[in-house]
Amino acid sequence: MSLPLTEEQRKKIEENRQKALARRAEKLLAEQHQRTSSGTSIAGNPFQAKQGPSQNFPRESCKPVSHGVIFKQQNLSSSSNADQRPHDSHSFQAKGIWKKPEEMPTACPGHSPRSQMALTGISPPLAQSPPEVPKQQLLSYELGQGHAQASPEIRFTPFANPTHKPLAKPKSSQETPAHSSGQPPRDAKLEAKTAKASPSGQNISYIHSSSESVTPRTEGRLQQKSGSSVQKGVNSQKGKCVRNGDRFQVLIGYNAELIAVFKTLPSKNYDPDTKTWNFSMNDYSALMKAAQSLPTVNLQPLEWAYGSSESPSTSSEGQAGLPSAPSLSFVKGRCMLISRAYFEADISYSQDLIALFKQMDSRRYDVKTRKWSFLLEEHSKLIAKVRCLPQVQLDPLPTTLTLAFASQLKKTSLSLTPDVPEADLSEVDPKLVSNLMPFQRAGVNFAIAKGGRLLLADDMGLGKTIQAICIAAFYRKEWPLLVVVPSSVRFTWEQAFLRWLPSLSPDCINVVVTGKDRLTAGLINIVSFDLLSKLEKQLKTPFKVVIIDESHFLKNSRTARCRAAMPVLKVAKRVILLSGTPAMSRPAELYTQIIAVKPTFFPQFHAFGLRYCDAKRMPWGWDYSGSSNLGELKLLLEEAVMLRRLKSDVLSQLPAKQRKIVVIAPGRINARTRAALDAAAKEMTTKDKTKQQQKDALILFFNRTAEAKIPSVIEYILDLLESGREKFLVFAHHKVVLDAITQELERKHVQHIRIDGSTSSAEREDLCQQFQLSERHAVAVLSITAANMGLTFSSADLVVFAELFWNPGVLIQAEDRVHRIGQTSSVGIHYLVAKGTADDYLWPLIQEKIKVLAEAGLSETNFSEMTESTDYLYKDPKQQKIYDLFQKSFEKEGSDMELLEAAESFDPGSASGTSGSSSQNMGDTLDESSLTASPQKKRRFEFFDNWDSFTSPL
């Protein structure tokens, strides 16, 4: 790789260039005096000049503006007299096309080069606000076959403009001043070839003005010329080239000849999504030349920042040997935020601009990126100075950034994070405040510093729920509170409020279950996304404080849930959005969440899309699916909108396991299943029942619970997948539950494995490795009794228990499939519990057993202290009697195996069997295969009473 030029080398090159220009100017002036007499003779006899048959007329530039740097090229086959001019010469003079005969130099025999060129005017971008330049100051070069020639009126004078004004903006953002008139580019090589190929005496010259198109002239006739060197037909297929980062795209319909050209380029790349071809900039010239030779294709070139439709490489080929004017080139760029303290100037090289950069006190130069950066406090100063440079356009930072970083623009702090004051939480329940971890307390401080409007995007398992409750409690005087959550966790939020705000009465919480419920019935109103869209009429009363859990559900502004939620968020004074998976790779999905928190940020999505979504204009409209300037977007969000911490950032503050009860919605249990559950509960409390009959009724109740939980379990799993969970384990016991889960995952095309009692040992190991090595979404559906030991799933950090098991040792062993050697994260354990089912009695029973073992020193695990939302148990005598029955049934030695075998052999459809006639009275229609898992060998439960194995180190 070649090393970049130093400043001294650049200065030396520039000095040599200026010396060469001066020498050439002196030479041209000397030759000009030698030709004065011949030029005067032509002017003195206009009729003779008019009748000269072989005189070639100078070719004007194809630049679309009269003030631009113009190159004039002419092929001279002989040194004859001046060519014919129109009778109405004054009209052509007004347009700047024709010159007076005395202004037209005569070709010098023996000294004319093959091509004759003239450089006139100033830089094209200056056409927007052109200074008045005397005609004598316009620089012009005309080359003969051996020496350069100049007209008598030309003087070599450097362009000077003592007073500079900011350039006016172009009329359209889709075109630059260089090609605003729609003129296609010229290729110097192709023109030279065309001139050489012309017959003797038929030289083609181009005549162009700021308002007319390029026209070739052959044998004294003017003909309209298309944009390429090859004559294009009326029905030629039109397309254009568009910049795409460091490459360019070709937007055009299908053309077999052009596709063949595409395939010959080494940097070709076809995008099947957009159905477009893109190439490296190195192949641009080759592609344009090939496209110009195709009569069926009319390809518009790139729009360059230099104000020309030609690439620098293409135009430079036809201008070899000509002196360039670097001081007249036009550069355009923009400012980009690279940190809280610094911004960067993303712009091409300009000598004047570099000199200005060096005047800034905080300047920094990155050798790798070759870009300059400055402190934010110098942003306004730099932009003001750059506006004094007529050849430079540097766009400042967007208004949104200047508002978000107003304090930094005033006085820059080098701190990586903003200073957040400590919030006064004295009026919040002490139980809640005392249970906040340090990073959670910092999150509450951040939210209050932002006025209660933020996107809390902490990683999953970092306690966004408790932080949101604390933030909302700080603004308790502004309640009623609206909480919008996924349907599967409505009752989990209810339990969380009751746990962390003990001063709150249970009657104050209103969980909306159906579309007929009132949305404003309580001080705290909890509703699902889907029901919110059905209760729009009740949203006329504004809520001042709103919590949105899993706010990424609002990513699509066209959905009913988003249309219902956005008006509520716009009028709310406090908006607390919770999301564990902000879509940083697809900024378009973040837009609705950003404007929900900060409505004044990017009121128009298009401005947001252009800067951060890599917006592209396609034949069918704008494409916002990409991403750009993600570093700047992240800085903006973290400064004003979003707070995000990863598990790796706060791992030292997290426990090894975080257990959580998820109270699933009982409303999903249908009437038939509810009636069966009630009948089974009644059967257990009926008097005059033997112990065996009571135990059979208990097993039936346990099986009915499995059937009742299926819809809510599936809904919760799908919510986890939609929330961005990539890998997790799901444990269940009944075969009907395992089957329902796997069927839904197959229907949703989610990669998963299943291990139950029918899975062989060799197959288990293969499935385990498949799950461990998978990089995509993966769910392991496991049987509690068949896959609770001997397997390692450390690549996941979440375990979901769809069902409870009466022996806590089995549950702990199942948890440890994830919490093993190789696990580098805190493990989340979610227990799905349904009210009104056997879970009401199994969960307290599990806690009681663990507590007894912990007091005896046989277990280090305490479910009560390590689990959220543990305080629920029905208090009426009937429920207590059922709980006692569960406790007595499972406390006898060997009862585990007996009850397990009874549950597995239970056939509710038969009149005989373990359950007797009670199953007939229940009217159950489920068969045995759908209710129980595969039969297990007795050796799988020999470890139940060996509690040391549960507490020994991994």
Swiss-Prot record:
Protein name per UniProt: SWI/SNF-related matrix-associated actin-dependent regulator of chromatin subfamily A-like protein 1
CDD domains linked to this entry: DEXHc_HARP_SMARCAL1, SF2_C_SNF
Ranges for region Mediates interaction with RPA2: 5-30
Recorded consequence of changing residue 764 to Q: In SIOD; increased ATPase activity; abolishes annealing helicase activity; no effect on specific binding to fork DNA; no effect on recruitment to sites of DNA damage; aggregates in the nucleus; decreased chromatin binding
Consequence recorded when altering residue 9 to A: Decreases interaction with RPA2
Coiled coil: 3-34
Family: Belongs to the SNF2/RAD54 helicase family. SMARCAL1 subfamily.
Tissue: Ubiquitously expressed, with high levels in testis.
Positions bound to ATP: 458-465
Compositionally skewed regions (Low complexity) per UniProt: 909-919
PANTHER family found in the cross-reference section: DNA ANNEALING HELICASE AND ENDONUCLEASE ZRANB3 FAMILY MEMBER, SWI_SNF-RELATED MATRIX-ASSOCIATED ACTIN-DEPENDENT REGULATOR OF CHROMATIN SUBFAMILY A-LIKE PROTEIN 1
Domain of life: Eukaryota
Extent of motif DESH box: 549-552
